[in-house]
Structures are given as C-alpha cells and as structure tokens.
C-alpha cells in the first residue's frame, strides 16, 4: 500500500492572492490594553489635567 501524502502547498499561493495579501491596518494610537497599569493610571490623570488647562485657556481668551 502506498504511503499517504503528509503535506502539499498546491494552490495555497493562488488562494492567498485572490483577495491580495494585505499589510496589517495601521492605527493612529496603539491600544493601551495590556499596558502597564501604573502608566495607564498616570495617563488618565495627565489627560484630565490637559483638558482642564485647555478649558481655562478658552475661558480666559
């Protein structure tokens, strides 16, 4: 009895290129998910301070 085929790459390249091989989507900001918790907490307070400073600058102008 003949040995069974273990692997073939036939047609895989054609299938892959039918819709084109695309690069991963680039985003403006990377996700903060799984980022260091201490950094995220500090970022939250830093952003809050920035927003308040902008509001005060608009109010005084």
UniProtKB/Swiss-Prot annotation:
Cell location: Cytoplasm; Nucleus, Nucleolus
Recorded family membership: Belongs to the eukaryotic ribosomal protein eL29 family.
Record lineage: Eukaryota, Fungi, Dikarya, Ascomycota, Taphrinomycotina
InterPro entries in the cross-refs: Ribosomal_eL29
Disulfide bridge partners, by residue number: none
Gene coding for it: rpl29
Main location: cytoplasm
Keywords: Cytoplasm, Nucleus, Ribonucleoprotein, Ribosomal protein
Protein's recorded name: Large ribosomal subunit protein eL29
Species of origin: Schizosaccharomyces pombe (strain 972 / ATCC 24843) (Fission yeast)
Known role: Component of the ribosome, a large ribonucleoprotein complex responsible for the synthesis of proteins in the cell. The small ribosomal subunit (SSU) binds messenger RNAs (mRNAs) and translates the encoded message by selecting cognate aminoacyl-transfer RNA (tRNA) molecules. The large subunit (LSU) contains the ribosomal catalytic site termed the peptidyl transferase center (PTC), which catalyzes the formation of peptide bonds, thereby polymerizing the amino acids delivered by tRNAs into a polypeptide chain.
Transmembrane segments: none
Chain residue ranges for the region called Disordered: 1-32
Biased composition (Basic residues): 1-26
A GO CC term attached to the entry: cytosol
One GO term of the biological process aspect: cytoplasmic translation
GO-annotated molecular function: structural constituent of ribosome
């Amino acid at each position: 009895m003949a040995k069974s085929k273990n692997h073939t790459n036939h047609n895989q390249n054609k299938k892959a290129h039918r819709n084109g091989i695309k690069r991963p989507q680039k985003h403006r900001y990377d996700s903060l998910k799984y980022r260091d918790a201490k950094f995220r907490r500090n970022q939250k307070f830093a952003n809050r301070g920035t927003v308040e400073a902008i509001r005060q600058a608009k109010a005084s102008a």
